[in-house]
Amino acid sequence: MRIDIVSIFPEFFGVLDISLLGRARQSGLIDLRLHDLRAFTHDRHRTVDDTPYGGGAGMVMRPEPWGEAMDEVLADDTDPVVIFPSPAGEVFTQAMAQELSAEPHLAFGCGRYEGIDQRVVDHTATRARVRLVSLGDYVLNGGEVAVMAMIEAIGRLVPGVVGNPASLVEESHSDGLLEHPSYTKPPEWRGLAVPDVLRSGNHGAIAAWRREQQLERTRRVRPDLLPD
């Protein structure tokens, strides 16, 4: 999978050089390409923002550097999905992560300030498949944190990135429910014991217990995930 990121803070994504995604990059499973938005400016101040038409607080990111950055991202004509993090977008879910993990090319545009000039989104939509995506009903200082979260969720679903694919099946949201509690050794710690069923060796009973724990936890914490 190829992933392009456009940002005024490309160094923010240095963390992608470590852990599972770092190994995925080294092995060629993920081809990450960072684009510094300021590299597409042509004034000595490397300006990427300006005051909004119509007035209002804050600054808006100018279309010119964004247009040139997207020209570079889209130059290979690979028909990527271009994602702009936005509180006005559709909410990112595990199902969306699974869907996007099958795409050969994703591109992310990290907005800042009061956002990106809408013409950038509109023009990009004439050249690629554009999606506005939100992490939830709150506002961040910029798109970098949201993009990091999405890449982490999507990248680990790319075949070969996670060593044991079975672990992906057992996680929260993989089947629409929250994950069951997990335990390891020792069998007792500070007066708290591992549930007997998990030490019984009865795989049917263990599966039933885990399923019930998923349902109970989902009913208690995220009842909105359960069917009506």
UniProtKB/Swiss-Prot annotation:
One of its GO terms (molecular function) is tRNA (guanine(37)-N1)-methyltransferase activity. Its main location: cytoplasm. GO terms for biological process: tRNA N1-guanine methylation. Pfam families: tRNA_m1G_MT. Keywords: Cytoplasm, Methyltransferase, S-adenosyl-L-methionine, Transferase, tRNA processing. Specifically methylates guanosine-37 in various tRNAs. This is tRNA (guanine-N(1)-)-methyltransferase. The lineage of its organism: Bacteria, Bacillati, Actinomycetota, Actinomycetes, Micrococcales.
